[in-house]
Swiss-Prot record:
Induction description: Expression in up-regulated upon exposure to itraconazole.
Protein name from the UniProt record: Transcriptional regulator of the unfolded protein response hacA
UniProt-listed Pfam families: bZIP_2
Entries under InterPro entries matching the protein: bZIP, bZIP_sf, Hac1/HY5
Organism: Trichophyton rubrum (strain ATCC MYA-4607 / CBS 118892) (Athlete's foot fungus)
Gene: hacA
Region (Disordered): 1-27, 41-94, 208-256, 331-384
Record region (Leucine-zipper): 106-113
Disruption phenotype: Leads to changes in the cell wall and cellular membrane composition as well as an increase in susceptibility toward azole and cell wall disturbing agents. Presents significant defects in important virulence traits like thermotolerance and growth on keratin substrates. Also leads to changes in the pro-inflammatory cytokine release during host-pathogen interaction, with an increase in TNF-alpha and a decrease in interleukin-8, which might be related to differences in pathogen-associated molecular patterns (PAMPs) in the cell wall.
Residue ranges annotated for the bZIP domain, each copy included: 90-153
GO annotation terms (biological process): positive regulation of transcription by RNA polymerase II; response to unfolded protein
Role: Master transcriptional regulator of the unfolded protein response (UPR) that recognizes and binds to the UPR element (UPRE) in the promoter of UPR-regulated genes. Exposure to antifungals and ER-stressing agents initiates the activation of hacA which occurs when a 20 nucleotide fragment is removed from part of the exon-2 and part of intron-2, which in turn promotes the arisen of the DNA binding site motif and a dimer interface domain.
Family note: Belongs to the bZIP family.
């Protein structure tokens, strides 16, 4: 009994377990379609209940507008003190907002001025650019025109070289003059054969200009006429010359400085550089007359025999007479002044154009010397 029961149970378990080679069937209906929802269970007559939604985020506080007036701070906190209470923090916030507004206003003003400056520079540069473009177009047109004229002139020059007597040579010269006047009308002359012809005519006329001088001492008139054919213009110049003017016309500035009397037509004989006449040397009689002109009587030469008395000197001071002999061979200040006066008199009486001083030893005798050269050579101061 027991074995039969165990065999039936084993058979039933084997029939229920799937075979290892059998495939699992696939589902043809979605599980979501078979799931019941809460809305489907509620009857149609009853109102639907809204489900609660999650809480929304708190909106961010927007920035206040610039035109909004700030409240007056309730506290008066010093600048360097730390804010602790809410009123003090509000005061710091208001001060910060005011500083930011002022800085923003300054920044906007600076940007506005900079933009205006850049716009002005832009307008100025645009105007300059337009002007330069117009100038460039004008210069290009002028350059093209001149290039055409140069090419035409080159062809005419080649033609004139091949045929010198043809009318093309004359037109080439005219074209050369016109181009020269066009390129530099105020700085360069007209390069034409007429210019060189005029220069040759002027050189020829210079040699043929007459200069006539009458022997009469009165002023004479010499008329010089020079006629040039440059651009059909004739010039006539009249010059009044005198013998004195002709003499001084070729004088150098140094000659005029040395002869002031001749320049002002004074009645003093004029001596040219090649007509200098030196007077003969002065004799002893002339020297005696010149030196003794101020004295009423001849000099007293008795001290040469009797000697010089020292009693005449105050306190017997021999300082000024520190010499061994009675002859002073060196010139003193009085002698130099007298020599200068004598030289001036000689120049005024003779009329030298240049002052040439004579040797000092031959003009003035020293102290104690004879005027008639009767002493020995060692004593006479005037001996050479």
């Amino acid at each position: 009994m027991t074995e039969s029961t165990f065999a039936v149970e084993t058979f039933s378990m084997d029939s229920m377990s799937p075979s290892p080679g059998a495939e699992i069937p696939r589902l043809t209906v979605s599980p979501a379609d078979t799931t019941l929802k809460f809305e489907d269970l509620v009857p149609e007559g009853l109102p639907k209940v809204d489900t609660p939604k999650p809480a929304e985020k708190k909106p961010v506080k927007k920035r206040k507008s610039w035109g909004q007036e700030l409240p007056t701070p309730k506290t008066n906190l010093p600048p360097r003190k730390r804010a602790k209470t809410e009123d003090e923090k509000e005061q710091r916030r208001i001060e910060r907002v005011l500083r930011n507004r002022a800085a923003a206003q300054i920044s906007r003003e600076r940007k506005r001025l900079e933009i205006e400056k850049l716009e002005g520079e832009k307008l100025k540069i645009e105007q300059q650019n337009e002007f330069l473009l117009r100038r460039l177009s004008q210069m290009e047109a002028e350059n093209n025109r001149l290039s055409q004229q140069v090419a035409k002139l080159a062809s005419e020059i080649q033609t004139s070289k091949s045929n010198p007597g043809s009318p093309a040579s004359a037109s080439a010269s005219a074209s050369t003059s016109s181009i020269s006047a066009t390129l530099a009308p105020s700085t360069s002359p007209t390069l034409a054969p007429v210019l060189f012809k005029q220069e040759n005519d002027l050189l020829d006329n210079i040699d043929s200009i007459p200069f006539t001088i009458n022997p009469d001492p009165s002023t004479t008139t010499t008329t010089t006429t020079t006629t040039t054919t440059s651009n059909n213009i004739s010039s006539t110049s009249s010059t009044t010359l005198s013998p004195a003017d002709l003499d001084h016309s070729s004088a150098t500035p140094s000659d005029l400085a040395q002869h002031p009397a001749a320049v002002f037509h004074l009645n003093i004989p004029l001596l040219r550089e090649h007509d200098h006449v030196h007077p003969p040397p002065l004799s002893d009689a002339d020297l005696s007359r010149l030196f003794d002109a101020d004295s009423s009587s001849e000099p007293d030469l008795s001290f040469l025999e009797d000697g010089f008395s020292l009693e005449l000197l105050p306190d017997s001071d021999l300082g000024p007479f520190a010499f061994d002999s009675l002859v002073d061979l060196g010139p003193d200040e009085d002698n130099q002044q007298q020599q200068q006066q004598l030289q001036q008199k000689l120049d005024d009486s003779i009329g030298f154009p240049e002052q040439t001083p004579l040797p000092a030893s031959g003009l003035q005798p020293s102290f104690g010397a004879s005027l008639e050269r009767c002493d020995e050579q060692g004593i006479a101061a005037g001996a050479q």
